[in-house]
């Protein structure tokens, strides 16, 4: 296996060396690196065309050139552009071309290898016997690059034997010509009022001239007789019948001898002329690429059709039911072929539209139900206090012990803020006009009771207060008056400023009622008093104790 790989590598190296040492009209058979991309053309076809002198060989392009340069300057610029290895090969080819003879290919390759290694190490004096003289090398290079021209596409200077376009007679080098090819297969351009092409109707348009945009681009080439001596290692069998071996090529044997060169712009050649080399000729695989692209497009279209049909067949259950119903009711579908893809797609879209409409209706019903539940929520909250009001009214109608209400009021009094308010209210009673009394108006009793309950800080919610106010309006005046008298005659009436003021103004209340004196206070409650004398009236603390005992006894 190792011997096989080594043998293949050796054959490839020999083929590469053979192509490198081949010289046609002072040019090479391989590109010189103007374009870094891999060659897309058929190399064998291009090399054969160059050997047949139907196409300009590959020359090393120069970045700059002037006709006024001396010979040494031209040689220096060319050798610098070629590099040491290609310069040695060129020198070897020029030396071998002096004899104008073609020897054995292997002997020439062996001689070229030895000459290349020798030329890289020797000095410029060239005093070694059998080596090419400096004068002849200079003459050969200056002859090849005499009257160099610039390529309008790559802007490099090449020898004057250019390719010329068949349509407009514009120069173009072989480096640029072999890169021009057809575009990739694509859909045709659609203009207005034209039907849309199918996905697999691909086309491959011929390459156009980069100068005049003429289709089916091609070039013509006429070799320069002055450069014929600078050819080396050419096989005479590869030359066409109308081209003589080098050294004997004459003007009469050229097929284009009757055409002035460079050609005139008015002279045009047909794309199928035998002297024209078209881009399709050096890129013969364009038909294969077009057919491959069409087959690939057909496969994609077929796969898409199968996928769509599969999705339609495996759609919703109601869609299948609708399809079956339509088929059963269709009088023209008895034993007939399956429906086309367009009809199935229309049914599928109709079913999707129905599903979307049903979903929209369902969403609207859900929104309406949620709105109704939101609106009914406050009415339920309002209706709850009604039952509470009824129960509260029943409690008010039933006679309750006086001490129960007193205990609730005493608990409210125990807070420091209530005691302070009680002291302030009692002081206002003592300093007020005791003789001024006023009969309590029965019509203002509900409002009065509501103010009393609010100021005594009863911990009731706002709905309960509103319910109590509504309830007071509905009870009998007798029960209201009775409850009010019980509150006014209670011993703790002086702790509430409103009850104390009502008690002071009432003419029916006994002035000797047991009212807690504001001058008395208890140290446990944290109340300081200016007068600590004993009084016959019980203090707030004593009354609270008695009330607690009564509550426990009850």
Swiss-Prot record:
Biased composition (Polar residues): 122-131, 528-538
Family, per entry: Belongs to the SIP5 family.
Region entry Disordered, spans: 103-132, 314-343, 369-403, 523-554
Protein name according to UniProt: Protein sip5
Name of the gene encoding the protein in the UniProt record: sip5
TM spans (from-to): none
Cystine connections: none
Keyword terms: Cytoplasm, Phosphoprotein
Protein purpose: May negatively regulate the snf1 kinase.
Coiled coil (residue ranges): none
Bias (Basic and acidic residues) ranges: 108-120, 543-554
């Amino acid at each position: 296996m190792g011997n096989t790989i080594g043998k293949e590598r050796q054959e490839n190296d020999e083929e590469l060396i053979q192509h490198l040492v081949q010289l046609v009209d002072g040019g090479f058979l391989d590109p010189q690196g103007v374009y870094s991309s891999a060659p897309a053309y058929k190399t064998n076809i291009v090399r054969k065309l160059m050997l047949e002198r139907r196409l300009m060989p590959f020359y090393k392009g120069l970045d700059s050139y002037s006709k006024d340069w001396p010979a040494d300057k031209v040689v220096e610029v060319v050798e610098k552009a070629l590099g040491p290895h290609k310069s040695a090969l060129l020198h070897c080819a020029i030396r071998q071309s002096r004899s104008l003879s073609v020897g054995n290919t292997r002997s020439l390759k062996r001689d070229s290898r030895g000459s290349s290694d020798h030329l890289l190490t020797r000095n410029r004096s060239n005093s070694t016997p059998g080596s090419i003289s400096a004068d002849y090398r200079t003459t050969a290079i200056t002859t090849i690059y005499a009257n160099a021209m610039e390529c309008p596409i790559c802007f490099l200077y090449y020898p004057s034997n250019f390719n010329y376009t068949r349509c407009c007679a514009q120069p173009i080098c072989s480096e640029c010509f072999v890169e021009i090819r057809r575009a990739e297969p694509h859909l045709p351009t659609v203009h207005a009022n034209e039907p849309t092409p199918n996905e697999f109707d691909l086309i491959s348009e011929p390459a156009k001239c980069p100068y005049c945009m003429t289709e089916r681009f091609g070039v013509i080439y006429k070799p320069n007789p002055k450069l014929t001596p600078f050819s080396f290692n050419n096989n005479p069998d590869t030359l066409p019948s109308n081209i003589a071996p080098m050294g004997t090529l004459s003007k009469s044997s050229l097929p284009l001898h009757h055409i002035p060169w460079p050609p005139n712009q008015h002279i045009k050649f047909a794309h199928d002329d035998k002297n024209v080399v078209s881009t399709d000729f050096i890129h013969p695989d364009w038909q294969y690429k077009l057919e491959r692209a069409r087959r690939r497009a057909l496969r994609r279209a077929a796969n898409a059709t199968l996928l769509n049909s599969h999705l339609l067949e495996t759609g919703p259950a109601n869609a299948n039911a609708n399809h079956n119903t339509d088929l059963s009711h269709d009088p023209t579908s008895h034993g007939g072929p399956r429906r086309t893809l367009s009809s199935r797609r229309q049914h599928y879209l109709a079913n999707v539209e129905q599903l979307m409409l049903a979903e929209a209706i369902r969403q609207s019903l859900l929104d309406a139900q949620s709105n109704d539940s939101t609106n009914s929520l406050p009415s339920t909250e309002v209706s709850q206090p009604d039952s509470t009001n009824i129960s509260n009214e029943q409690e008010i109608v039933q006679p309750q012990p006086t001490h129960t209400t007193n205990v609730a009021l005493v608990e409210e009094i125990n807070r420091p803020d209530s005691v302070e308010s009680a002291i302030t209210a009692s002081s206002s009673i003592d300093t007020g006009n005791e003789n001024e009394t006023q009969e309590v108006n029965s019509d203002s009793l509900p409002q009065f009771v509501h103010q009393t309950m609010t100021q005594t800080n009863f911990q009731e919610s706002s709905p309960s207060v509103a319910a109590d106010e509504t309830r007071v309006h509905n009870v009998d005046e007798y029960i209201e008056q009775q409850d009010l008298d019980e509150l006014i005659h209670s011993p703790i009436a002086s702790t509430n400023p409103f009850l104390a003021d009502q008690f002071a103004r009432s003419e029916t209340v006994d002035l000797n009622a047991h009212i807690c004196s504001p001058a008395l206070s208890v140290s446990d409650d944290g109340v300081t008093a200016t007068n600590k004398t004993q009084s016959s009236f019980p203090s707030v603390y004593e009354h609270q104790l008695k009330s607690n005992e009564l509550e426990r006894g009850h």
